[in-house]
Amino acid sequence: MANGPNYKIKPRRRREGKTNYYKRYVYVISKQIRFIVRITNKYVIVQIAKIDPKGDIMVASAHSSELTKKFEWKGDENNTPSAYLTGYLAALRAVKKGVTECVADIGLHVPSKGNKVFYAIKGAIDAGLKIPIGDISIENDRIKGEHIAKYAEKLKSENLDLYNKLFSRYLGRGLNPENLPSHFEEILNKIKSSGG
């Protein structure tokens, strides 16, 4: 807690865990367009923003709930395939508006292997944006959700009750989780044909 007269309280958004002001300062100085990825407990949110003295200007954005509403995505809205699709959708919209290059802004997310943030960035790169991310290894089978399908197959044979409990949202929407990779391809083609 506060000790002595020299103690300074950190800014509110830093205390709330929303903004890293050091990184924010670097982005403002660089004046580059940011590719912002935020992962919540339910959704993936992707925004492409320009820096402006009055406040950030959103060039394009995508929310993983759009996958369900507009493109009939039947999987979870915050898993790895939906992160990829959301990044792809946002990038298509940005490319339409003339954006060609961005800088990744992952906020307070830890840049660790297998983080969904990098799958959203990979989706944007595949859609045509140039985003420098360095040496991050991205597994292509995880993009399609093959790891989820394999786990679902294994669980279905071992424990049907747990399978029904863990994949209740998939089953409620009419998708067998074992068919997730083919469903992913179908939704990706819908996004490509719609053009964002």
Swiss-Prot record:
UniProt-listed InterPro entries: Rbsml_uL18_euk (IPR005485)
GO biological process terms, semicolon-separated: ribosomal large subunit assembly; translation
Pfam families: Ribosomal_L5e
GO molecular function, one term: structural constituent of ribosome
Alphabetically ordered keywords of this record: Ribonucleoprotein, Ribosomal protein, RNA-binding, rRNA-binding
The keyword rRNA-binding appears for this protein: yes
A single cellular component GO annotation: cytosolic large ribosomal subunit
Taxonomic superkingdom: Archaea
Similarity comment: family membership: Belongs to the universal ribosomal protein uL18 family.
General function of this protein: This is one of the proteins that bind and probably mediate the attachment of the 5S RNA into the large ribosomal subunit, where it forms part of the central protuberance.
Subunit description: Part of the 50S ribosomal subunit. Contacts the 5S and 23S rRNAs.
PANTHER family per the UniProt record, alphabetical: LARGE RIBOSOMAL SUBUNIT PROTEIN UL18, RIBOSOMAL PROTEIN L5-RELATED
Protein name: Large ribosomal subunit protein uL18
Organism name: Saccharolobus islandicus (strain L.S.2.15 / Lassen #1) (Sulfolobus islandicus)
Top-level taxonomy: Archaea, Thermoproteota, Thermoprotei, Sulfolobales, Sulfolobaceae
